[in-house]
């Protein structure tokens, strides 16, 4: 059996990092696609020359032709404009919607059997639009949001309690933006819920509330510090974790922007929920019990996503 094929749409910072991680983990051969001539080819050549040093045999190629993604097992989409300081994810809507149309049509024509992971912002709207334009089953198109947001939450929690990140499990629901819902009571340190650790006097509610707020603004904090560009190492690592779950049929429970149809009282849109990812793609949506505060927070997030979808439909009537 031949190697798996990973197609990366967008050869920017996230795309390049995805290519390196996929090759290092030997997930398969990598095709790095971009509309800018020379960029994917140059990055692919540079990355290929890491192989003799890092010891991987994965082939990495660059292309400007969607035909070269044909037969891809996994496609990770990062194409589009990145956030700039002062720009919200939603400001990106008009520009990146057009990009998703081109990408969706390219996937539909060349790799209709792939498992597609969208990273382009504003995430919850872009993954929905990409699914609409590509026509793929909802179970085979998912957005990378909660894995990254939970990683940020976990990092801050590990710092607060001065413990290994390996012992921290956190959980973020809702849209990938300021309305996300970090669920503190389902977040644990080696199985001990964070609220219990607060009761033990190991932290304070004020500090945990500040961590929740910082998690919500995690992407913006990095954008402001960088001055130009946005986060790319952790987003790429998050996308690779999702790809590994699919390729290895790992049945991992990961928070992702998945198509929700009745669960959590939500109908017909993509929003961050815990899902099982295996060889069938999104195999199950895990519906956990939420308290009133988390339910209210999720509803605010859902309403924000709905507004974005309505804006998408106005910008491109074919989506209506």
UniProtKB/Swiss-Prot annotation:
Entry keywords, A to Z: NAD, Oxidoreductase, Tricarboxylic acid cycle
Binding residues for substrate: 83, 89, 121, 152
InterPro entries: L-lactate/malate_DH, Lactate/malate_DH_C, Lactate/malate_DH_N, Lactate_DH/Glyco_Ohase_4_C, Malate_DH_type3, NAD(P)-bd_dom_sf
Family membership noted in the UniProt record: Belongs to the LDH/MDH superfamily. MDH type 3 family.
HAMAP family for this protein: Malate_dehydrog_3 (MF_00487)
Listed name of the protein: Malate dehydrogenase
Task of the protein: Catalyzes the reversible oxidation of malate to oxaloacetate.
Pfam families reported in the protein's UniProt record: Ldh_1_C, Ldh_1_N
């Amino acid at each position: 059996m031949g190697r798996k094929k990973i197609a990366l749409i967008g050869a920017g910072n996230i795309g390049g990092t995805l290519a390196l991680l996929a090759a290092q983990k030997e997930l398969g051969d990598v095709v790095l696609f971009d509309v800018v001539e020379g960029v994917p080819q140059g990055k692919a050549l540079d990355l290929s020359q890491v192989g003799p040093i890092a010891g991987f045999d994965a082939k990495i190629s660059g292309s400007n032709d969607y035909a070269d993604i044909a037969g891809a097992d996994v496609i990770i989409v990062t194409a589009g404009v990145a956030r700039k300081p002062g720009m919200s994810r939603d400001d990106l809507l008009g520009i990146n919607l057009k990009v998703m149309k081109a990408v969706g049509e390219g996937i539909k024509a060349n790799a209709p059997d792939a498992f597609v992971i969208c990273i382009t912002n504003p995430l919850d709207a872009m993954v929905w639009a990409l699914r609409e334009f590509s026509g793929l089953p909802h179970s085979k198109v998912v957005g990378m949001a909660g894995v990254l947001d939970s990683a940020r939450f976990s990092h801050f929690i590990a710092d607060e309690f001065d413990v290994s990140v390996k012992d921290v499990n956190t959980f973020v629901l809702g849209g990938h933006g300021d309305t996300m819902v970090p669920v503190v009571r389902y977040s644990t340190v080696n199985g001990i819920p964070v609220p219990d650790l607060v009761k033990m006097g190991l932290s304070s509610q004020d500090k945990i509330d500040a961590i929740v707020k910082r998690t919500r603004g995690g992407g913006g904090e990095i954008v402001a510090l960088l001055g130009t560009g946005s986060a790319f190492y952790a987003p790429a690592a998050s996308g690779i974790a999702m790809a590994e779950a699919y390729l290895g049929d790992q049945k991992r429970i990961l928070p992702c922007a998945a198509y929700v149809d009745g669960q959590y009282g939500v109908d017909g849109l993509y929003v961050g929920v815990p899902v099982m990812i295996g060889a069938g793609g999104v195999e199950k949506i895990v519906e956990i019990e939420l308290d009133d505060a988390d339910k209210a927070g999720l509803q605010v997030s859902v309403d924000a996503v709905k507004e974005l979808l309505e804006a998408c439909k106005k910008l491109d009537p074919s989506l209506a």
